[in-house]
Design a protein with these regions (language model features):
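Hydrophobic core positions of alpha-helical segments in small-molecule transporters
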Residues: 40-41, 100-103, 122-126, 158, ...
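Residues that mark transmembrane-helix kinks and helix-interface sites
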Residues: 18-23, 78-86, 109, 132, ...
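Hydrophobic alpha-helical transmembrane segments in multi-pass integral membrane proteins
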Residues: 49-59, 107-124, 161-178
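Alpha-helical transmembrane segments of compact multi-pass small-molecule transporters, enriched
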Residues: 44-49, 100-114, 129, 190-194
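A helix-boundary/kink motif common to multi-pass secondary transporters
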Residues: 33-34, 93-94, 120, 178-179
Length: 217
């Protein structure tokens, strides 16, 4: 399969998976808070990833500097970014939170230019402008619509900024490590530990509620 076709397949698969994942998050939000949902997801996925890495381990994968970069990405992405994404779905609903989360290319362009020295072409800049225009349309709110509040719009936008910052650290870490499998494992583990530790600082009602069986389904 050609690289372009393979890239398209991965992009479409990611979009389908994200949509299905968001629906499950919306359903799970009825039984637990956002922090619980993210922590359960990390608890479920990290051990199998670690087992595969252990089974396929190569000596050249040991790189503390790469692990530090990936851990920073794990704090921003799987921990902070995903919690805010779950919260956005709860407060704004799936049909608003998901399109706003799609503003990630906007922040990716900003971070790519500012931190990585990338120079996007006119097509990328035009696409970014369309994203901004779409966000303006999505956030239009009729006066009689009481199902959501504009004061919650910061949640998905800050979450997207966290994910975009995570991508910068992820890119730097993967380039040093040259193993996407190890990278996602380190990020997931770091995100799980950071989220568990930081959740102790949250109000009681926002802390992980792992004792609710329906939240795990």
């Amino acid at each position: 399969m050609a690289d372009s076709a393979l890239a398209g397949f991965f992009s479409i698969s990611t979009a389908v998976s994200t949509g299905a994942f968001s629906v499950l998050v919306r359903r799970g939000g009825s039984y637990a808070n956002a922090v619980t949902g993210v922590l359960i997801g990390l608890i479920v996925t990290t051990p199998p990833l670690a087992a595969v890495v252990w089974a396929l381990w190569r000596p050249e994968w040991w790189n503390p500097r790469a692990y530090a970069l990936l851990a920073a990405g794990g704090l921003l992405g799987p921990a902070i970014g995903r919690v805010l994404y779950f919260a956005a779905i709860h407060y704004l609903g799936l049909t608003r939170a998901l399109p706003l989360a799609a503003t990630m290319p906007l922040f990716a362009v900003v971070f790519g230019v500012g931190l990585l020295g990338e120079r996007p072409g006119p097509e990328v800049m035009a696409g970014t402008a369309f994203i901004v225009a779409g966000c303006i349309i999505i956030t239009y709110k009729k006066a009689e619509d009481k199902s959501w509040n504009r004061r919650h719009l910061w949640i998905p936008l800050v979450g997207v900024m966290a994910f975009s910052g995570s991508h910068v650290f992820r890119k730097a870490g993967v380039e040093l490590l040259d193993s996407p499998l190890v990278a996602i494992t380190v990020m997931s583990f770091a995100g799980m530990i950071c989220l568990f530790v930081l959740s102790r600082l949250l109000p009681a009602g926002q802390r992980p509620q792992l004792g609710r069986p329906k939240a795990w389904l």
